[in-house]
Amino acid sequence: MSSRVTLHPGREKSLLRRHPWIFASAIESTKGRMNLGDTVDVYSHEDVWLGRGAYSPHSQIQVRIWTFTQNESVDNGFFQRRIARAQQSREELIERHGLTGYRLIAAESDGLPGVTIDVYANVIVCQLLSAGADKHREKIVWALKAQFPEHGIYERSDVAVRKKEGLEEITQVLAGDIPDEVIIEENGVKIIVNVKQGHKTGFYLDQRDNRAIAAQYAKDRDVLNCFCYTGTFGSYALAAGACSVTSLDVSDLALETAKRNVDINQLDSSKCEFINHDVFQALRDYKAQSKQFSQIILDPPKFVDSKASLNRACRGYKDINMLAMQIMAPGGILATFSCSGLMPFDLFQKVVADAALDAGREVQIIQRLSQAPDHPVSTNYPEGFYLKGLICKVL
């Protein structure tokens, strides 16, 4: 007999809408031997089968659903089908844009809760962030090898959220030879990706379309790229004809890579300045110096990691947008982003509006932006929508 979870009366509604999470408070009882990451069957209080998922007793989300099909086993074939489907759904995008770097698996949105997989040329980088994903590591690697027999596979599960699942952080080679760096190309721009030490899996693929959109406004402008990481917004801007690009970050490694990205794209490095400085303080310093820019990119790290921190995050977003608006030349373009899934788009837009009031500037929103299409959002899992951005004209 399989292990099973029975829900409290009425708590099956989200599963009937095929949402993949079951919180601890929804569980009435469990039956059978259930270890971390084990596959369990989920039943309603009325004993109706609802789904099959991974058990995680240490997490608030105690079951993450693998499948809503009762006769589908969670075996090698299951992961092979999911990965093949995800690759097929991205083929048109890959071919249309000539991508060599893309997100292959976007966790719950691709039917694999807790699994993030990015492809960088001939290297695959995966993050296994849930108990179920960790439990099925060998099956996932087997499926990846079947789909990509020539690729190296590297695990970057060095993420604090694993501790909530009762798991340790880990990085390791899973297959093949893994170089420290890989070069990918998107929209004609080459990008150095450090798969072993870079942020996340090495790079922010979700901003691909937004980099191209921001670059459309860069010609003949002086661009300030805040939280620049490896400088790709800046490389795009230079390629589009920017007069100058000033890149700010607090990582020497990121700034050095940003310089190298300029060089490998054969762009004019004399137009570039790379500064290791806290962005908030740098913006205040520019204001004190009466220095202005005609395009500013604000792509900060996640400010919101819990609902309790949302108000504090709003203050941070407002302050940084206000400071940017205060040093913007008339008619300048602000590209501002939030990668915090807990920040609603309407609230983010309100925060930017409040920043404009405090800055004493008239501001127009001319585009609303989101994550690239290889980061899809399942209609059953709206939490998959996290990246939001605004292109604003500061009058």
Swiss-Prot record:
One of its GO terms (cellular component) is cytoplasm. It is found in: Cytoplasm. GO terms for molecular function: RNA binding; rRNA (cytosine) methyltransferase activity. Its main location: cytoplasm. Residues 2-79 form the PUA domain. Belongs to the methyltransferase superfamily. RlmI family. This is Ribosomal RNA large subunit methyltransferase I. It comes from Pseudoalteromonas atlantica (strain T6c / ATCC BAA-1087). The gene is rlmI.
